Amino acid sequence: MPSSPSLLHKALIVCFIAFSIPAFVQNKADEKKQIAVQMENAMVNNLLKPWYPASIDTLDGGFLSSFSYDFKPTGNQDKMIVTQARHTWSNSKAAELFPNVPYYRAGAEHGFKFLRDVMWDKQYGGFFTFVDRKGNPKKGGFSPKEAYGNAFAIYALAAYYQMSGDTSALNLAIKEFRWLDKHSHDPIYKGYFQHMQRDGTPIHRDAKTPINAELGYKDQNTSIHVLEALNELYTVWPNPLLKERLSEMLYLIRDTIVTPKGYLNLFFHDDWTPVDFSDSTDAAIMKHKELNHVSFGHDVETAYLMLEASHTLGIKNDTKTLMIGKKMLDHALDNGYDNSVGGFYDEGYYFKDKPGMTILEDTKNWWAQAEGMNTFLIMDKYFPNDPHHYFDKFKQLWNYTQTYLIDSVHGDWYAQGIDKQPQYKTMLKGQIWKGTYHNFRAFMNCIQTLEPDTIAPPIPTDLKLDKSTASLNWTPSPSNKFTGYNIYADGMRIGYTPLTRYDLPKNIKGKTLTITAIDMHGNESEFSNKVYLAR
């Protein structure tokens, strides 16, 4: 048996490896660390601090939505389910990232109570789309119930449970999933109907529906955010029907909604035939362009959401989803990106009588740039030598964001890049469609990709079965970061809790039970000791 190398020999090997690493690799690693520091500072001090706790409505519940450019509350403060859910989600995630900052956890609980007590329709179920500041339902140009908004409610409730362990939040998320699946899911053609009456009846198009109205169509935006919501819920509630619907949405988006060229069709008839005006005159196309254009921001966002769902579903070697996601980013980069200063344009179109892509709107909204940075880094991880030079594009887009989107004086991001629309310097910072969700999520994901935390929490110990209460109890994982626990029965994941007690379902008998510790980045420990629940 060969002897172990000496300490000097080991040191020489380490030195040789270090000096053998090309300078550009070291420089790239240094750049990543530097940008991660910049992003964390921007995330905490420029984004989260201006919003929280200032946006908490201590008078009427929920969150204030409308803020002026210098972060003063303005307007009537009507409340939309999407905004309220997103703020609840952001506070839940911030509480995991920064457990020593008490107002994030308090803000998440505050948001959950508003969703539960005000936005939930106690008569018919489901969440109202739009209410006034005091919680009275309003039309506001929306359908009474919408799948998009109800999906974000699931998203928020699952995140709040993941952070808090409040089972009433998980139960409401499950109740909402079942309500949405009963009323909005299409059992024939799959997917979900977006528009619903208050009682959950889907609204279909008829002869009176204006031709340029979204009402009654299925759409990509609802679909990708239903996917996202089901993904979030599945991480804490691994239910078979939920898994089936999550898989269904992934394959529907990837294989039907994404076109062969690599962009999303936007609106659809019930059978997923696209709403398409490309055979019409240019004037007709422009009249209906809100229903039929290329949205580069949604394309780069969807590339990420598909990969996230594939990972959550545990699909091994899913090269098909990866390559379609890459195609979507490449298409947006080749056709809808400003190579001179950076930034994804808002809208493009393929006219049949014109070569290539025509840019309809060369403006650059804030959320597309946030999503773009995240997806650039994902593709750089998988394809570091790709001729698109994803990391260089990421750096350019981050520089663009710092220069033309981030308001270093008053906080947060402008709604549109001021290289194209300087008037946005003094326009609203917050409104029902603009909170912290897109850029906060992008910051979290980018920082984790730039400086990956790949260390799993320590294994939880002393797992015990309390037969009198049919519950598991254990000693927590001694980790200095937020840690939750996955529950397994005969090797299959059956649940999650951030607490150190889990009440077992009634059907879990005759099973061997064990747990793992898992952090917010998905790093999971080895299994704990095992216990057996007899029949």
Task: Show where each model-derived region lies.
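Bacterial Sec-dependent N-terminal signal peptides
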Residues: 1-29
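Glycan-recognition and catalytic cores of secretory/periplasmic carbohydrate-active enzymes
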Residues: 26-468, 487
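A generic structural signal for beta-strand entry/edge sites
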Residues: 189-191, 467-471, 499-503, 510
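Pro/Thr/Ser/Gly-rich low-complexity, intrinsically disordered linker/stalk tracts
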Residues: 451-480, 520-535
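An aromatic-rich alpha-helical recognition segment common to small helix-rich domains
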Residues: 460, 474, 487, 504, ...
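Solvent-exposed loop/turn segments flanking beta-strands in beta-repeat/beta-sandwich domains
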Residues: 477-490
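Short beta-strand segments within Ig-like beta-sandwich modules, predominantly Fibronectin type-III
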Residues: 492-499
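Beta-strand-rich modules
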Residues: 504-524
